[in-house]
C-alpha cells in the first residue's frame, strides 16, 4: 500500500480494489471519494456553510445522508479549502469523507468546553460476516450500511490509537442491540488508554 499514493488515480483504485476482491460497488465508492478529494486538492480540512448541518434530514452528520453516496444527483453543497479551492460536492459524499467536524460556539455553556472535545460515533454496530458480499450488496441500502459500519469502526480505532479519547460515555438504548463485539471494543480501548 506504500505504492498507492504514487500511482495515478485509476491505477491506485485498481490496486486498492484488490483488498476487497474487486467488488465493483466498493471500487465505485472509492472512485467517487477519491475524485471528490482530488477536486479539493486532497486538502485535510475544508469549510462548509451552516446549511451543511440543517435541516437535520439532509445534514452531513446524519448517517442517513450516506444513502446517496454513489448517486451523483445527491443534493450539492459548496465547500472551500484553506487554500481557497472551491468546489461543490454531493452532501452524501461530504458526509462520507468527513472524519471530524469543528463547530465554533458563540457562547460556551460551561468551562468544560474550553478543554473538551465531544466525539459521537453514531451507528456503531457489529461488523457483518457475509459469505457472499456481492449478493448482499444487491439489497437496498446495504452499501451505505457497510460503509457506515466500517467508517465508525475506523474512526473509533483511529482516535483510540492516537489517544484522543480520554473519557467515554457509553449510551445504549433499552432495545436489543446488535453489537456483540462492543464489550471487546471497549476493553481494547481501556487497555490502550489506561
Language-model features, listed with the residues they occupy:
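Globular "head" domains of long coiled-coil molecular machines
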Residues: 1-194
Amino acid at each position: 500500500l506504500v505504492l498507492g499514493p504514487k500511482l495515478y488515480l485509476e491505477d491506485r483504485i485498481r490496486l486498492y480494489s484488490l483488498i476487497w476482491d474487486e467488488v465493483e460497488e466498493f471500487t465505485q465508492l472509492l472512485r467517487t471519494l477519491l475524485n471528490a478529494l482530488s477536486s479539493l486538492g486532497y486538502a485535510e480540512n475544508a469549510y462548509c456553510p451552516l446549511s451543511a448541518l440543517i435541516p437535520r434530514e439532509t445534514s452531513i452528520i446524519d448517517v442517513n445522508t450516506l444513502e446517496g453516496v454513489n448517486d451523483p444527483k445527491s443534493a450539492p453543497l459548496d465547500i472551500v479549502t484553506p487554500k481557497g479551492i472551491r468546489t461543490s460536492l454531493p452532501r452524501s459524499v461530504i458526509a462520507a469523507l468527513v472524519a471530524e467536524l469543528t463547530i465554533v460556539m458563540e457562547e460556551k455553556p460551561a468551562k468544560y468546553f474550553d478543554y473538551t472535545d465531544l466525539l459521537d460515533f453514531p451507528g456503531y454496530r457489529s461488523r457483518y460476516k457475509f459469505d457472499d458480499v456481492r449478493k448482499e450488496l444487491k439489497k437496498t441500502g446495504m452499501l451505505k450500511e457497510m460503509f457506515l459500519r466500517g467508517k465508525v469502526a475506523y474512526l473509533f480505532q483511529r482516535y483510540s490509537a492516537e489517544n484522543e479519547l480520554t473519557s467515554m460515555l457509553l449510551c445504549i438504548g433499552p432495545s436489543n442491540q446488535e453489537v456483540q463485539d462492543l464489550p471487546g471494543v471497549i476493553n481494547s480501548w481501556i487497555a490502550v488508554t489506561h
